[in-house]
Amino acid sequence: MRVLLVGASGFIGRSIATKAPEHFELTGTYHRNKPNLERIELEQFNFLDASVDWSLIVKKYDCIIIAARANGNTESSRNEVSRQANNAFTRFIEAVRESQSKPFIVTVNGSLSYGECGEKLVQVDDQINPTGYARSYAIAEQPLRDFLTDGQEVAIIRAPWVIGAGSWFPMMYLHSNRIPIIGNGMQWMSLVSVDELAEYVWKTVESSKSGVLHPQLTYRCRQKEFADIVHEVTSKKTQRIGIVR
C-alpha cells in the first residue's frame, strides 16, 4: 500500500513514521525541518501553497494521512493559517472526489474539539464545541468533517492529551519550578502516549475504518492526581493557578 504522511516532521508525525509497518510504502512530507527518519522517502512540501495540484498527489497514493497542523503564536494568526488550511483541504477533497482512485484519508486532531464536558464521557457522535487552540484547528478540519458527513472514506482520529518526548509535558510539568494544579484540579485528563497513538493510526489505515474515532487511552485521571504523580517522581512542589481560557 502506498501511503502519504503529510507532516512527518511534527511531534505526532515523526512517531507515525517511525511506527510504520514494513509492508507499507511510505512517503513523508516536511515543510522546513527535514526529519531524520529511516525507511521512508521524504519530500519537502507546503500543503498551504495555493499552487499545489492536489490531483497529481492524490492519484499516487492508496492512503493519505494528515498529521500536519497550522500553527501560530496568537489566536488571530492561528485562525488566519487555519483558513489557509481550510482552502488547501477543500482543494484536496475536490481532487479526491474527481479522482478515479479514491485514497483512504486519515486525519489526526484533538479531543479539545468537544469543548468543556464536565463529568460527561465524550462519545464519537457528539457535536464539536471547540475551546482554546481547537477553535482554530476546527476551521482547518471543516472540509474533512463535511467529507465524512457525505458518507465518504475518511477517519477523523480525535486524540486526547498526547504525551511523549517533545510534547507539552516537559514544558508544563518538568521545566517549570513548580507543578501546576489548574483551578480546583478536578478536570479530567485523558492521556495517550505518542507511540500508542501512532500504532492506532496504522491499525486504522489497515482496517480502512471510517468515522470519528477515539484511540484507546493510556491513562485517565483528575488533573490534580496527575500533578501529584509528577510531584512524587520529581519532588517538585505543586502550585494552584487559575484556569486559562
Question: Where would I find each of the regions flagged by the language model?
Answer:
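N-terminal Rossmann NAD(P)H-binding glycine-rich loop of SDR-like oxidoreductase domains
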Residues: V3-H23
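N-terminal Rossmann-fold cofactor-binding loop
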Residues: G28-K34, F47
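NAD(P)H-binding glycine-rich loop region in Rossmannoid oxidoreductase-like domains
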Residues: I40-R91, A95
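Conserved Rossmann-fold NAD(P)-dependent oxidoreductase catalytic core, especially the SDR/UDP-sugar
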Residues: T90-G132
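Catalytic helix-loop patch of NAD(P)-dependent Rossmann-fold dehydrogenases
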Residues: E116-I156, W161
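Glycine/proline-rich active-site loop of Rossmann-fold NAD(P)-dependent oxidoreductases
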Residues: A138, G151-Q152, V162-L174, K203-H214, ...
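NAD(P)-dependent short-chain dehydrogenase/reductase
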Residues: L148-M189, V194
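Mid/C-terminal beta-alpha module of Rossmann-like enzyme folds, strongest
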Residues: Y200-R245
